[in-house]
Amino acid sequence: MLADLTVKDFLDKVACSDPVPGGGSIAALDGALASALSTMVARLTVGKKGYEASEEVMQHAQTITLRLLDEIIALIDKDSAAYNEVFACFKLPKTTDEEKTARSAAIQEATKQAALVPLEVARKALDMMSVIADVARLGNRNAVTDACVAMMSARSAVLGALLNVRINLGSLKDRDFVLQLQTEADAIEQTACQREKELLDAVNQDLRV
């Protein structure tokens, strides 16, 4: 399991010549880092003097970010597995017409799954961004820049994951499926970039001296 590796071992694995783990798994890792960091900010707020009014929001934020953390960690490996399945389908026999038909169908189905996994990463990272915005707004002011880094990591997760969605859509024949995912991907990207901009603009303005 990729998620069980040390940071050094994971990075060494990414840096090798194998195509997995690649950008999709890294996008999921970005999302996991965003979740972990936003959880830290919430925990630095709970129980602190002056933040009593934020207690309930921070407790709820922790519940959501920890759930998303577990879900996105699972997607780190799931993305690599989806790629491996597509690769395996290309190795299927293609001597007879029947084999060619079966191979083509298998490739199409595996490619759909390879598009759906990063889409799920993008969805979860986008969900996280709304929580991060609350954590940044109401959380410990000494950790507001940590919340911003969490937001940027979540945005990176979204954009990286959506690139992997789009590259897989390019080889699919099911145009209804392609249009559906393209439409959702475009909407997610627009919302993610807007959420990041709103937070960074506000925090950078506050930090100016």
What are these regions (language model features)?
Residues 128-131, 143-202, 209:
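Preference for long, well-ordered alpha-helical segments
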Residues 2-21:
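Short, hydrophobic/aliphatic alpha-helical segments
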Residues 37-44:
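A conserved active-site cap/scaffold subdomain adjacent to cofactor or substrate pockets
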Residues 79, 83-152, 156:
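Amphipathic alpha-helical interface segments
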Residues 49-87, 188, 195:
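A structural-propensity feature for long, helix-poor, extended segments
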Residues 48-58, 97, 144, 172-179:
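Short, surface-exposed loop/turn segments at secondary-structure junctions
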Residues 29-33, 61, 68-75, 114-124, ...:
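Amphipathic alpha-helix face/heptad-repeat signature
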Residues 16-37, 143-161:
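Conserved phosphate/anionic-ligand binding catalytic regions in large, soluble enzymes, centered on
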